Amino acid sequence: MRLQRERPQDAERLVTKIRGYEIALQDEAFAYVAHHYPDTFLISAKLLWKGISRTTPRFNAWSESWGGDDTLFNAAWVAENVQNKGPLGKVYPNADYLWEGDTPSFLYLVPNGLSDPNQPHWGSWGGRFTAEKVENILTGTGNDTVDPLLEQHRPYQMFSDAKDSWTHEEQEYNNEYATVFRWRRAFQNDFAARMNWSITEEFTKANHHPRVVFNGDASKSVVELKAKSGTSITLSAAGSSDPDGDSLAFRWWIYPEPTLANRSDDSLSQWTSWFSTLSGTETKLQLPKVATPTSYHVILEVEDSGSPSLFAYRRLIVQVMP
């Protein structure tokens, strides 16, 4: 507050650098900040954090948030892959409610090539959020302690939960929790691999992430390009490698929700037919015909054959021009 009074321009510049991600609106802190400093970049994982893992039998609530492969984060999985792995694993606690409820805030920042922390609506291991800030959000759980405190700070705005449509073993989901649990296999394998790293000094005794090259670019940055409506472009992962010499599986897909953002596009339901192949190191993408500039989010997902298998990604945003 002193900085704001004495050097308002510096205060404004500082605010633009702040990034915040909170879980479940457990207090009024973010509402206070958002009210007094409306330009602050704040994300509220209002409910989607529940998608990180299934609640324990002892608690057994929030069934609406269950989805994906729950065997990848239950007591048996934790015992085998975490608690049984060295001194760190020994101090890992059992869950009273659910495991890692706050971890989506960390997963949001993991630099795996999938996401950009400055673009909350693009989606990440830590969930996907709205493209625009939402006004005066409450806990969503009827918390009669926190909700009145939040209301004292109106008006305030934050990015908050968005929904993904995702299918797993013929079960269709369309909710905010799916923006997290759709990635469970990937982030749980990552967790298991890191525990393995903690118990060996030999590189060859643990698995490591693939290194993905996209159209000659070996960084983890999002690639953006423009292309003509109705034309075909070649997408290549040639040069991708694995530090352990594992074989690699390549998957090409379009992420519908960040592609659609605030528009509708019935043709997007046919996106699988736009690719010459959905696997392999190279594919051709037949671009749709558009009347106005339209962006499509293409994901290259690479999985190695190690144990546990590990994932890496690249994201291409193709702006299709009329």
Labelled PLM ranges:
Residues E303-S309:
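Short, solvent-exposed loop/turn segments at the edges of extracellular beta-sandwich modules
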